[in-house]
Amino acid sequence: MEKNDKDPDHDDKSKGDEKGDVVSDAHPSDDAHHQDGISNENVDVVGNAETDHQDPGDNNVDKVSQGEEAPEIRQTLESLSEELDQFLPTLSLHMEEHKDSTEEKGEDGYFQIPQFVGKFLDLFEEKLSKYDSGEPKTVWYQDPEEVSSLLEAVDRVSKLMGLLLNTKSCLDHHESLINHAGSIQQRAMAFLEDEFRIILEESVTKESVVVTDDSNSQRRSTADQQDHQNDVVVSQDHDQMLVPECGDQEIEYPGYPEDVVVVLRKIAEKMKAGGYGWECREVYLVGRRNILMRTLKQDCEFEKVSIDEVQKMSWDTLEREIPIWNKTFKDCSSLFFPGELKLAERIFPGDEGNLFCIVTHGLAIQFLGFAEAVAMTRRSTEKLFKILDIYETLRDSFPAMEELFPEELRSELRNEVTSARSRLGETAIHIFCDLEHSIKSDSSKTPVPGGAVHPLTRYTMNYLKYSCEYKDTLEQVFKSHSKMEREEEEPVESGNSAFASQLMRIMELLDGNLETKSKQYKDIPLSCIFMMNNGRYIVQKIKGSAEIHEVMGDTWCRRRSSELRNYHKNYQRETWGKLLGFLGHEGLMHNGKIVKPNLKERFKSFNATFDEIHKTQTTWVVNDEQLQSELRVSITAVMIPAYRAFMARFGQYLDPGRQTEKYVKYQPEDIEDLIDQLFEGNTSSSSTATARRRT
């Protein structure tokens, strides 16, 4: 590099200019702005300052000529920075003045570069070496003055390089200086790039935010709340709907303190001004993507999975992944994505949209791919509620997420969501309608012991009850995504939605299936008990769900209750009507006298028949306490008055003592006690009716 030692006077002349900033060639629009600020007044001031600055030098020359040793003038990076700040406008002015002549003649004349420029570069290089020497790198950016000093020095080097590279005389005569300055600039930018990465990774602080997941809160508050790792379980053997607890949750966004954001923004500005904006952006993009994914994994247990991986998952595994997906999608929509947009805006103002999209767009597409993959898995009834959960999450949370993206990406994401929701909706409809097919195909020939509620009834009603907890969503799904043709079916009743009509169709099929299964019992009374058990269970489930009751209506419930009363009457007639026949007077009187042999036989027949009824019907099952009580009360109301009247009328004709004990096995109170033992599902080996004899 050619040192500036040819003409001291030329050095003085080169410094006549304003004190101001000059921007690099990467930003020509700013050059014009600063050039407008140049004035002759400023040039004179700087020129005078330079003249004054040379006086000590002249004295030193005289002293040297007289054999005296000149005192050393200590130059610091700060003092040289001030001199460079005064010189840069001069160089900028020279570049502008000779721009036209350069274009016309291909030359702009020789321009002297002061010696302090090289000295400044040397001292700045020493400063960089100090930072690279192994000392803690966190020190400098925690000190505001050090941050300002370093970044201003970097900015001066970038401005100097921009002017040198755009001034032909400098390119022609100061190649060595340009190479030296360029090397230092590259080193400085590499240092800032590393520091930007370190600060980005190591200065993350978690900002706690409380969010309320109130989606479906009304639905879930009405369902039975029990601890379970899965979201929904519909059991064929139990009456529980297992759903998760919901409410306020505290989630943490991986952000930065304000002072750290300021440092990151300043570094980004200086790197961009020096022509290294792309490198800074890349560091930011990679860093924030990693931080975001790490946070989602640690706090939400979310991990990226491909469509192929989703489709290969067992349902047990996928069932655990779906609630994680739902929570992560909601958290990204309400906190993480808005946080990323705000952070990009604070560090890269004016370019936040592009950076935000690059950080989050891939994750958004991953979310939607998961949803579509779930919809494409093999259909089964237990998947319905998980699929509806995903559908609701997309429906309720995507609009807020969508608004964060620019229009061109917004349209793409909207199309992806529409596609995913369509697949989910169609799958949900098929699964719900598969319940109809499962009822039709259930042809089990083994009757349920004791006439209890059939597992198909329990499963279907639990399924329908919880389905109706999603009633609004299912109504929307059937309306928006149903492509099923039912030309062979009767038209939908006026005023009923497609979902309501499908639900009523399922109820009709269940009724018909139960009627068929009741015929599997050879004992007609037990068949009646079976229909009463299942009918009461259905009615109670419907009355216990406002949503399903709204669909089925009061008329349906009244009609079903009437059918239950008919089964009750049939049971009572078939069982207790025969027993009441033994308590009649016919055949016991002849010519006004009691026929004792007939009376004794009548008591024996009554006892044997009652014992058989008791033995059999204590094994029958009526789990509904109200129905069990109603049956016992109605039996007691019929049997006890009749038996008590029969005993009062004919018991006196049996001889007291052994004869009475032999034929009068039960007192009315004993009969009442034994009736209260019916329908307990008692399968013990005892076949003898026992009751405490009352005296």
Curated annotation (Swiss-Prot):
Where are residues bearing Phosphoserine located in the sequence? Answer: S215, S217, S494, S605
Effect of disrupting the coding gene = Partial male-specific transmission defect due to aberrant pollen tube growth.
In the record, Phosphothreonine modifications are located at: T212, T446
In its record, the post-translational modification comment is: Phosphorylation on Ser and Thr residues promotes its ability to repress pollen tube growth and to regulate cellular architecture at the pollen tube tip.
Give the highest taxon in the source lineage: Eukaryota
One of the record's GO molecular function terms: phosphatidylinositol-4,5-bisphosphate binding
Changing S215A: what effect?
A: Phospho-dead (PD) mutant with reduced inhibitory effects on pollen tube growth
Outcome following mutation: S494D: Phospho-mimetic (PM) mutant with constitutive inhibitory effects on pollen tube growth
Mutagenesis or variant effect for S605A: Phospho-dead (PD) mutant with reduced inhibitory effects on pollen tube growth
What name appears for this protein in its UniProt entry?
Exocyst complex component EXO70C2
Output the lineage of the source organism: Eukaryota, Viridiplantae, Streptophyta, Embryophyta, Tracheophyta
